A protein has these predicted regions:
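Conserved phosphate- and dinucleotide-binding cores of soluble alpha/beta proteins
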Residues: 10-162
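Divalent-metal-activated hydrolytic enzyme cores
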Residues: 6-7
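Short active-site oxyanion
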Residues: 1-2, 44
């Protein structure tokens, strides 16, 4: 049995006959396999270029093993060259943007895009990610933030570069 982190992936998998289950139907997942936008040496990640990072983080957190597959261009010494996606409630977008600017970053609305949960994404650039766990928690503590694309608390267990 398989699960998917986005509505688009679920549709594609069902088209080829893969039986998809809900995370609500299982206690845990043995393996979660996905890519990343950036990977640091300590296996922290930035994910969410496709806008599904909240669901991806939920599934990764419910998985015994999180395997990340990427090409060498995704490996970085320090996270933050790729914008950090921040999923926000629409009514809090401007408030969250001001708070992100106070952290030293530049948020930009991902125009014309809504997440599978119907929320907006602010792509945050220009901010140093010296401590992925602290920044992940600091961004998530802003009222109106659903989640962000830093995977510091739930890092990948293994990286496969190909």
């Amino acid at each position: 049995r398989d699960s998917s982190s986005s509505d688009a992936s679920t549709r594609l998998l069902k088209e080829i006959g893969v039986d998809i289950f809900s995370l609500n139907d299982v206690d845990e997942i043995d393996f979660y396999i996905d890519g990343a936008d950036e990977i640091s040496n300590d296996l922290s990640l930035i994910k969410g270029g496709g806008g599904a990072h909240t669901n991806e983080k939920i599934i990764a957190s419910a998985s015994k093993n999180f395997l990340c597959i990427a090409d060498e261009s995704k490996m970085v010494d320090e996270l933050g060259r790729f914008p950090i996606p921040v999923e926000v409630l629409s009514q809090a977008r401007s408030f969250v943007a001001r708070k992100l600017m106070a952290l030293g970053g530049t948020p930009r609305l991902r125009h014309g895009f809504l997440t599978d949960q119907g929320n907006e994404i602010l792509d945050l650039s220009g901010i140093r990610v010296d401590d992925p766990i602290s920044l992940e928690m600091e961004i998530n503590s802003i009222p109106g933030v659903v989640d962000n694309g830093i995977f510091g608390l739930r890092k990948a267990d293994q990286i496969f570069i190909g």
